[in-house]
């Protein structure tokens, strides 16, 4: 590795940028502090960010406490403004690329089998001729989301450009395409970019008007309402199975190419922790059954790999991959800031300022492959009546102790029971709560409250003010609209706008 420590005027003091010459199979790593941004330009050679190829002579902006790497397999020169961070020749991307080749072969063989084109002797390695359904497990700060994103990006930019694998996120602490507390899935057909920690899996159609098709994702979302799986694991298992059932319905409807594309599941770090107990095992089993998993990828942990091999190795291929050296520790304070940024991003969109050292008139500054000016939203603040929106809480703090349950009743029933919330009650906790607006039930018949847990989400709002005497509340939403007759669910996720 090397760099050219000179400024735009050729001086050698106080450079505003650096030119890094990356050797083959090496990567440039950076971690951004709050309220900072950098611009990265590929000058020559080949480079990618988690499988998304960078174009030459285009400035890519990164901000929002982004922690990422620029990797090259053949060598390249990049320009960084302002000068920051370091390079490393220790990278796990080669291992991730090898895994992606295996999954590509599975897709091709699966499609050939469906089309009747697979002939005996053309698969000497006995690679499974089934779509790859991949469950990714690993401890906290192991780079699970990074691996999932890289595998998706390698799939959609390969020789078969019509692959559209489904990316599933069952980590409620992540937020993915919406807000923390949710789990979701989306079909991906073009690469996902990395520019900010608030958009770990790219943008969705609900976050801002976009141009590039990969950002116009319409995810299927279910509301859990907490960031920790221990809060209500019964509810989490229920919505994981609901999500799996909806994905199965979609796979029946799509063509053979879509089914052969497979899916990749990102999981919470608690799935890798033995301290989570039996609930953790039941949630892993729910994922395997609901998404028909045939491959388990374990990042780093040898003990976890041995456990998964012992439990599922007879029917599922369990593979261990090394943890990337670029995976960094995120302390609780950082995670809280990121979750706050995700909610703010959902409401207001995202814009990264051009960093110091970059000429404001220089070329195109892209964020998520979009012009930076196109990513802001103008959220709507609306006053609604308490009677316009029916609010529920699923189990949670209002659950009765086991000793108080009726004879024969089970805790599982209580954990899934919707409880009506009265906003006029001082103890309701509605103020500053994130409310998930539920989609309408498909059936025209009589609906029961118990069925609310099975409904997906079509949007989120935040209660910013309560007027108890007039029985009104003010809600913030990304777009304007009417909320009359809506059903919403609240839990433990809240947000306050900071001036």
Tell what function each PLM region has.
Residues 1-138, 142, 150-154, 158-159, ...:
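Preference for solvent-exposed, low-hydrophobicity sequence contexts
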Residues 145:
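Walker A/P-loop
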Residues 246-316:
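Phosphate/Mg2+-binding loops and adjacent switch elements
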Residues 211, 278, 283, 448-450:
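Short, well-ordered helical secondary-structure segments
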Residues 148, 240, 280-281:
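Amphipathic coiled-coil/heptad-repeat helices and related helical stalk/stem segments
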Residues 117, 137, 161, 166-263, ...:
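Nucleotide-state-sensitive switch-loop elements of NTP-binding domains
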């Amino acid at each position: 590795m090397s760099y050219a420590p000179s400024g735009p005027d050729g001086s050698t003091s106080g450079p505003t940028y650096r030119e890094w010459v990356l050797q083959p199979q090496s990567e440039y790593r950076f971690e951004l502090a709050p309220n900072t941004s950098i611009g990265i330009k590929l000058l020559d050679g080949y480079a990618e960010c988690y499988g998304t190829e960078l174009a030459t002579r285009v400035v890519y902006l990164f901000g929002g406490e982004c922690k990422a790497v620029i990797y090259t397999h053949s060598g390249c020169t990049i320009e960084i403004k302002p000068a920051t961070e370091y390079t490393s020749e220790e990278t796990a991307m080669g291992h991730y690329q090898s895994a992606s080749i295996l999954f590509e072969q599975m897709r091709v063989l699966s499609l050939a089998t469906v089309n009747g084109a697979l002939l005996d002797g053309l698969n000497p390695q006995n690679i499974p001729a089934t779509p790859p359904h991949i469950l990714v497990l690993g401890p906290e700060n192991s780079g699970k989301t990074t691996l999932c994103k890289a595998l998706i990006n390698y799939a959609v930019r390969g020789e078969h450009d019509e692959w559209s694998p489904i990316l599933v996120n069952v980590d409620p602490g992540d937020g993915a395409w919406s807000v923390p507390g949710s789990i979701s899935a989306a079909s991906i057909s073009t690469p996902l970019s990395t520019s900010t920690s608030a958009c770990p899996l790219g943008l969705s159609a609900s976050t801002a008007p976009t141009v590039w098709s990969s950002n116009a994702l319409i995810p299927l979302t279910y509301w859990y309402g907490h960031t920790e799986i221990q809060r209500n694991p019964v509810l989490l298992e229920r919505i994981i199975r609901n999500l799996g059932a909806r994905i199965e319905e979609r796979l029946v409807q799509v063509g053979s190419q879509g089914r052969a594309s497979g899916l990749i599941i990102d999981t919470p770090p608690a799935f890798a922790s033995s301290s989570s107990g039996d609930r953790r095992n039941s949630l892993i089993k729910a994922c395997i059954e609901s998404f028909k998993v045939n491959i388990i990828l374990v990042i780093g942990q040898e003990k976890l790999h041995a456990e998964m091999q012992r439990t599922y190795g007879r029917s599922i291929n369990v593979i261990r991959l090394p943890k990337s050296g670029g995976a960094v520790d995120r302390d609780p304070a950082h995670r809280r800031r990121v979750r706050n940024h995700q909610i703010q991003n959902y409401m207001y969109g995202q814009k990264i300022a051009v960093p110091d050292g970059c000429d404001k008139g220089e070329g195109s500054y892209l964020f998520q492959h979009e012009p930076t000016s196109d990513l802001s939203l103008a959220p709507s603040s609306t006053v609604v009546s308490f009677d316009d929106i029916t609010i529920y809480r699923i189990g949670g703090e209002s659950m009765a102790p086991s000793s108080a349950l009726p004879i024969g009743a089970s805790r599982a029933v209580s954990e899934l029971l919707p409880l009506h919330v009265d906003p006029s009650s001082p103890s309701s906790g509605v103020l500053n709560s994130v409310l998930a607006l539920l989609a309408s039930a498909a059936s025209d018949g009589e609906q029961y409250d118990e069925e609310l847990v099975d409904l997906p989400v079509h949007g989120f709002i935040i209660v910013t003010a309560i007027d108890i005497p007039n029985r009104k509340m003010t809600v913030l939403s990304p777009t304007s609209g009417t909320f009359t007759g809506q059903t919403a669910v609240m839990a433990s996720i809240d947000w306050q706008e900071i001036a």
